[in-house]
Amino acid sequence: MFNLRSLSLATDFIEGHLRYKRKQVSGPARVVAIGNFDGLHLGHLALLEELRMLQQTLAATGQGCLQTVLSFEPHPRVFFQPNQPPLKILPFGTKVLCLKELGLDELAILKFNRSLASMTPEEFVHQVLVDELNAKAIVVGEDFRFGSKRSGSIETLQQMGERLGFQVKAVASVMHQQERVSSSLLRDVLQVANLPAYKDLTGRDYELSGRVSYGRQLGRTLGFPTLNLAMPERLAIAGIFAVEVFGLQPSGPVRGVASLGRRPTVEQQGRNLLEVHLFDWNQTVYGQRVCVRLKSFIRSEQKFDDLETMRLQMLQDMAKARDFLQKTN
């Protein structure tokens, strides 16, 4: 069973210094992959494959361990550069579902705040990896740094592992077409809605998940009722797409056309929203959790002079989406 847990560190922050509280190590042993896992690209998948192999190796020696991913919320760059936060690749909930589908046992979330940013490498290892997670093996990327001012290196981690009884495995970066696969690269391809490139870099279609919420019913008055899903601010991708929606029926996905963005024709500085018009569907599904898979980019968002002009464009978008989805059946 997949477990999502939020770690609460036993520390006090007093006058700029951490007062560390040791606690008795308890709970199951773990193999732990550390990272932001922003976008879950091929490099992240290589880390998770190494995690599985380490778990199997330890299991063969009689050491049963949970496969755990240790990640951070918010992204550390949001904490250090609040005025220039990185574009989000996946909403948090979608990332959780993707990790669950990969067969992990556990996702542990550590709140990235002033206390965590001030931890020395030694405090992080002792309190988080040893005391809290009871780690027997750690998997990180080859450029991993940790602790206050990024003062801890892989060598630091390996030296502490020798003393404290855990293994450390550094995984090399994955290359694709002579370019390092990274979250920054994913953001670049998403900003131009290059869905084939995203699939090459992650091994899967781009998808978004959430609960269907009530909207303004504007689409219904125009003849295009929609499912509405709230999206996080600063999502890296926007536009009009042909989509498949999962979670509505057991027989498979329902096809449709989706608008992802701020709807500049109907709202000024509107909230980020995913609106999906389903083909051949007339059931009410408010509150239901769905997964929307983006299959093809149709066009960028644009502001129309009036609703009738927008409606005529939506008819063209629907026709293009239907045509694409029928050809790929």
What is each of the regions a protein language model found here?
Residues F2, G215-N329:
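Phosphate/ribose-recognition catalytic cores of enzymes acting on nucleotide-derived substrates
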Residues P76-E142, F146-L164:
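N-terminal Rossmann-like or analogous alpha/beta NTP/dinucleotide-binding catalytic cores
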Residues G161-R262:
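Glycine-rich, Lys/Arg-enriched anion-binding loops that position phosphate/diphosphate groups
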Residues F2-R22, A108:
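Short acidic-hydrophobic, aromatic-tinged amphipathic segments that line or gate anion-handling sites
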Residues N3, D105-A108, Q167-K169, C291:
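Conserved beta-strand segments of alpha/beta enzyme cores
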Residues H41, L99, I138, Y198, ...:
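Residue-level signal for inorganic ion chemistry
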Residues H17, R22-P86, P91:
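N-terminal catalytic cores of NTP/NDP-binding nucleotidyl/phosphoryl-transfer enzymes
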